[in-house]
Design a protein with these regions (language model features):
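A conserved beta-strand-loop-helix scaffold within acyl/acetyltransferase catalytic domains
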Residues: 1-43, 84-89, 93-103, 107-222, ...
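Hydrophobic faces of well-ordered beta-strands that scaffold small-molecule active sites
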Residues: 47-49, 247
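The substrate-binding groove and active-site-proximal loops of carbohydrate-active enzymes
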Residues: 50-56, 222-223
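A gly/proline- and charged-residue-enriched helix-loop-helix capping module
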Residues: 54-91
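Aromatic (often tryptophan-rich) hydrophobic motifs at membrane interfaces
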Residues: 63-70, 177-179, 183-288
Length: 313
């Protein structure tokens, strides 16, 4: 089995640093790490397995879901949210109910088991030119393992959020990732600077085989310098130098709608070469069925109210 980074011991340490209770179990053909998420005013309590459970057979999936059901019942939670990886399955066979996006169901990966020249040759010509010439524009690249440097990424992400009118993770969430993951070599910070000013930054997750392009932001003011392109190209090549086998660009859309909210960064990621990988849709396994039905009905009603308010505006 090959668990995703979000099922790793490093991710468990991060979740525990946020004050969350984490449970880990395994058996024949299955294993999982589940996070206890207490109930709120808008949602009942649940167990959440990000990109899990990890299984190697249908029997293993059945056993994992049985173990999760038993754990959830003992904790008094109302449902379990899962994203099983390892086998193809029919959700109806396991009473799983598909829900809207939690983690991306598809990702884009680059095979690093080739020479750097071969990897670069698969990038679009514009990307290759930017990678080869960005230093001539006065730009420089560096890697940091210092958690204090996360402030540069956080600042850029706030700029991205303001410019694009999107919501991002809290400063505490991102800083805690840096505080926990960087000292144990499970993450890196990457920067492109113009003279001494950071204009593009990214945080990658790192395991033995894979580099995950997790969080990234760049200055809109300096967008014509294509710092984001130079940064990702450097991340890919440095992952190769570190002996990684895969660079996972972490989430794309398969929609052909040019107006899809992920269309832009999907095109950006695909421009570096690579291939699509199907992960898992997100599913709920109700434990307390009556409470879960009320939760779904309330969520549907809130969605309708939001849509109505948007039309009125």
């Amino acid at each position: 089995m090959n668990p995703h980074f979000l099922q790793s011991a490093a991710w468990q340490s991060f979740q525990e640093a946020l004050g969350r209770k984490v449970y880990r179990q395994k058996g024949i053909d299955w294993e999982f790490m589940a996070i206890l998420e207490p109930g709120t005013r808008l949602s009942p309590s649940r167990l959440y397995c990000p990109y899990g459970p990890t299984v190697s057979s249908i029997k293993g999936l059945k056993s994992a879901l049985k173990a999760l059901t038993k754990l959830a019942t003992s904790l008094g939670v109302k449902f379990v949210r899962v994203e099983p990886l390892g086998v193809k399955f029919n959700a109806k066979d396991f009473r799983l109910k598909k829900v809207n996006y939690s983690q991306p169901a598809h990702t884009w990966q680059i095979d690093l088991n080739r020479s750097s020249d071969e990897i670069i040759s698969q990038m679009k010509q514009n990307n290759r030119n930017i990678y080869r010439n960005y230093r001539k524009k006065g730009l420089s690249y560096r890697i940091s393992n210092n958690p204090n440097d996360c402030k540069y990424l956080i600042k850029l992400l706030h700029g991205v959020a303001a410019h694009n009118n999107i919501t991002i993770h809290s400063d505490k969430y991102l800083q805690t990732q840096a505080d926990v993951l960087l000292p144990i070599n499970s993450a890196k910070l990457h920067f492109i600077s113009l003279e001494s000013k950071v204009i593009a930054a990214a945080l990658t997750y790192e395991d033995e085989k894979t580099c995950y392009y997790a969080h990234a932001g760049a200055s809109h003011e300096y967008r014509k310098l294509s710092a984001s392109t130079a940064l990702l190209a450097e991340i890919i090549i440095n992952a190769k130098k570190d002996g990684k086998l895969i660079c996972d660009l972490y989430g794309i859309t398969t929609s052909q709608d040019k107006n899809h909210r992920w269309a832009g960064f999907t095109r950006f990621k695909k421009s570096f070469g690579g291939y699509e990988v199907d992960l898992s849709e997100t599913y709920d396994l109700p434990i307390n069925k009556s409470v879960y039905k009320l939760y779904q009905a309330a969520k549907f009603l809130r969605h309708k109210i939001v849509k109505l308010k948007q039309r009125i505006k």
